[in-house]
């Protein structure tokens, strides 16, 4: 067999690391379902035509080919080929259209699944990774109150993950209509281009963005500077946001009675409502940040990015927005709003920077020893009795010396070793040993209970990171 080799961008967790990931998944699912979201799973592949028209660049999409097709892919248009989904929003839009007759609307769904994206691998960024999404999709219309509710659900979920070493999270929100109205008021026409370049601000800096706005979007130096001024606006309450935005409109001579301002005001009113309502329900969780653009072109209203306190180098760990035109069926539209957590990035952060560790790699609480192979049936019976009572148990793989069986349990992190009565015909009893504390005492598989602290796998973080 050929020796395996790691492939850049395709992470594999060790068993104890997988325990941490699973606890994160379980926690997110619990929060999502507490808020009424319904779980689904979609297929891994979509038509190339669906993937390409949703704003993702073709160089980041993985296409599928059968071995006999290699070398002949050019005979098939990319739009007709199958590709791995790069997010969970595009599959959701297709899923909603295909199953609209069987779904309740508004349809609230959660989805935790792998996605594939041909990005350059780096710390915290992978080519194969798990995303955790929540969306609400309406039939024809979707009330704006969901644009407040969903970021707050995500804030609640991320707050729950602080027990695994995640710092405090804050959602930064903007509105595409606000930005577009302002840009049009400046005289700019390539709105999608401007949004894409502004979205790069944190990555490449203001001067590089200014150059791109001038070179690729047809902006003058003055227009580019005005775009950057808008991107610098932040606010934690609605009135502050309105005053700052209107002040910029006055400076740049955008009339308050024009169509451009009317468009911007629609977004301004929604964004003000979002941060005021979020401030009332969960102070400090959501703020207005007008540099948030989101590069994907299917967003039409609110857009969100989420940042961790003290981890600016990690970038946004949860993003999303409102999309009114992503899912359509003839004249029928299914507007939605959703957010997505890059779960693999969070787990990588927890493992390598927050020091999250599992108490043990094995879910078993007890290893039942085997005196000799002739008596393995007795050990299996004890393990089955424990399992029937909800106590996870394993049986030693061989009837080795007890010292080796104990070492095996220790390697797996199993805290208890069960010693069956070696002479059942005598009046002796089984015994169980806590190999962490050294305590050993008689035990009956019908009634014994492990200490609470050792009963389940747990996840803890390095004390220095608390």
Curated annotation (Swiss-Prot):
Q: Where in the cell is it found?
A: Cytoplasm
Name the EC number(s): 6.1.1.21
Keywords for this protein: Aminoacyl-tRNA synthetase, ATP-binding, Cytoplasm, Ligase, Nucleotide-binding, Protein biosynthesis
In alphabetical order, the GO MF annotations are:
ATP binding; histidine-tRNA ligase activity
> An example of a Gene Ontology BP annotation on this entry?
histidyl-tRNA aminoacylation
Membrane-spanning intervals of the chain: none
What name does the UniProt record give this protein? Histidine--tRNA ligase
Q: Gene symbol? A: hisS
